[in-house]
């Protein structure tokens, strides 16, 4: 629902590797869109190969968003590792890329409501400690919900016109501060040139 509200007009493009994990995530996305915005256009590439990225990127337009629902495939059909998939997809497409797992963060993806192996491990550890402390396992409720959290990289979101204030409260945000050099490079260079010119003139006048 967050992505649909941030990008109300664009198409949703789902990329995957054809695995069982991908199929499950694709089904979740389909169900969510059918419930929240049934008229939203979906483009699905269930077994995308890396050499197809240029054609995909050329067809995208402002307002579209990509969901990397698992990994993608190498040219020879092998699974691309997650880091490589995240980096290459986010570099190739001119729109934000949302994901399901926190190990994609840092590759250029925009983020999302992410599952974390660390958080899941911590939850499992808490259950183990309760059992070791003597609590009967049959009295411990089964944990069915993954301890997910909102995690975002503002660099790609800022390029798409999303402000940090548009994100859910409590979100983990990286690259929250804009780069002064990137955003004001022209102004900084102009000021530097003026200062150098003034100093040079002063030196000449004092000589």
Regions found by a protein language model. Give the residues of each.
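Membrane-proximal low-complexity regions enriched in glycine and acidic/polar residues
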Residues: 23-31, 37-140
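Alpha-helical transmembrane signal-anchor helices
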Residues: 175-207
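An alpha-beta-alpha
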Residues: 1-33, 142-152
């Amino acid at each position: 629902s967050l992505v649909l509200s941030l990008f109300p007009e664009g198409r949703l493009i789902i990329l995957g590797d054809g695995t069982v994990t991908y199929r499950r995530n694709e089904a979740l996305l389909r169900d969510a869109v059918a419930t929240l915005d049934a008229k939203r256009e979906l483009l699905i590439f269930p077994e995308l190969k890396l050499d197809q990225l240029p054609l995909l990127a050329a067809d995208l337009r402002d307002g579209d968003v990509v969901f990397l629902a698992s990994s993608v495939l190498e040219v020879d059909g092998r699974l691309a590792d997650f880091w490589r998939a995240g980096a290459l997809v986010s570099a190739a497409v001119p729109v934000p890329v949302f994901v399901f797992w926190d190990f994609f963060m840092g590759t250029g993806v925009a983020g999302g409501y992410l599952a974390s192996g660390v958080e899941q491990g911590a939850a499992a550890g808490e259950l183990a400690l309760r059992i070791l402390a003597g609590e009967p396992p049959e009295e411990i409720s089964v944990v069915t919900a993954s301890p997910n959290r909102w995690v975002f990289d503002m660099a790609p979101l800022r390029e798409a016109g999303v402000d940090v204030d548009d994100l859910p409260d409590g979100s983990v945000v990286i690259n929250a501060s804009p780069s002064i050099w990137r955003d004001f490079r022209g102004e900084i260079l102009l000021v530097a040139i003026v200062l150098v010119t003034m100093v040079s003139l002063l030196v000449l006048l004092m000589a």
